[in-house]
Amino acid sequence: MAAATPLLKDELDIVIPTIRNLDFLEMWRPFFQPYHLIIVQDGDPSKIIKVPEGFDYELYNRNDINRILGPKASCISFKDSACRCFGYMVSKKKYIYTIDDDCFVAKDPSGKDINALEQHIKNLLCPSTPHFFNTLYDPYRDGADFVRGYPFSMREGAPTAVSHGLWLNIPDYDAPTQLVKPHERNTRYVDAVMTIPKGTLFPMCGMNLAFDRDLIGPAMYFGLMGDGQPIGRYDDMWAGWCTKVICDHLGLGIKTGLPYIWHSKASNPFVNLKKEYNGIFWQEEIIPFFQAATLPKECTTVQQCYLELSKQVKKKLSSIDPYFTKLGEAMVTWIEAWDELNLLGTTWLSCLSPMVQQRLKSRCY
């Protein structure tokens, strides 16, 4: 009997930012090997990144990014995992799953390996409930349903744009919390998936994240972080705040909870504190900005919504620091680059090295 075809095998790309050899993929081989990988190499482009044999992938370094985007490459962060969003831009698939290279396969309470990708796909293919909270959490999961009192008119739910997974072992803490709790580990496995209610923000983590690129892709910009920027480690959260405002406006849902991955190592809290220092103060003004942000009804596409947000960022956050003027401009550049790359089809292939061209042609064209 033939093995079942993996879910969304030809409709999903796995995006991995990295500065090191990808030995961690061996652990993920049973789950990832059927899918196409987009590897975004950060740091020194002359360094050779080794990928285990048997994986279908394309790899982009900074030289590739500069060739493909030209002057617009300025919107892609350098020396920061925010560079992963370049992979979102060049993907031609409907769905994206992104994972960090220090994330391993976790086990459920029974000791079984968790297929994180499969759970993300299930989350994305089922509706969300952003407009009315179901106290049994996700009513579309096996063994659950809508509770008494849930409006029948809302039971069709909303399309799910984002599936936000969690982590066992090393928690995703900010630097001050890391310093206070250096030995804390997350050992609690909560068997739940829930929709984040409309009007509620959340701190999105990019290390175990999936989304519907067609529904929300242009909003998944991880900002200007890392080299030459006054802030770091806020890339995924910035994208999450923008995405949540846009999802609320467009009637889309975001789920959080399962699946878990095993986060294997803690980053240096002193290095993190230096990166986060400005953000720790700035977020006390950034978050109220997003809580109050509204988009006009004329904004009916993600791009229109994002460009409107960029105007509001420049107008209302630039008083905090000139960085936000630069960020607002980069948001516009990101959308321009996204539209050019996704509307021009294959014309940007000539910018790539012959090896990458061949990989792309054999896969897509």
Curated annotation (Swiss-Prot):
Tissue-wise expression: Expressed in all tissues tested, including root, tuber, leaf, petiole, shoot, stolon and stem.
Site residues, Required for activity: R148, R155
Subcellular location: Secreted, Cell wall; Cell junction, Plasmodesma; Golgi apparatus
A Pfam cross-reference name: RGP
Post-translation changes: Reversibly glycosylated by UDP-glucose, UDP-xylose and UDP-galactose, but not UDP-mannose.
Keyword Translocase among record annotations: no
GO molecular function, one term: UDP-arabinopyranose mutase activity
Glycosylation sites: R148
Catalytic activity: UDP-beta-L-arabinofuranose = UDP-beta-L-arabinopyranose
Matches recorded under InterPro entries: Nucleotide-diphossugar_trans, RGP, RGP_fam
Motif (DXD motif): 100-102
CC cofactor: Mn(2+); Mg(2+)
Enzyme Commission designation: 5.4.99.30
Keyword list, A-Z: Cell junction, Cell wall, Cell wall biogenesis/degradation, Cellulose biosynthesis, Glycoprotein, Golgi apparatus, Isomerase, Secreted
Residues spanning the signal sequence: none
One GO CC term, this protein: extracellular region
Assembly mode: Homopentamer or homohexamer.
Role noted for this protein: Probable UDP-L-arabinose mutase involved in the biosynthesis of cell wall non-cellulosic polysaccharides. Was initially shown to possess an autoglycosylating activity which is dependent on the presence of UDP-glucose and manganese.
Family to which the UniProt record says this protein belongs: Belongs to the RGP family.
Domain notes: The conserved DXD motif is involved in enzyme activity.
Protein name from the UniProt record: Probable UDP-arabinopyranose mutase 1
Provenance organism: Solanum tuberosum (Potato)
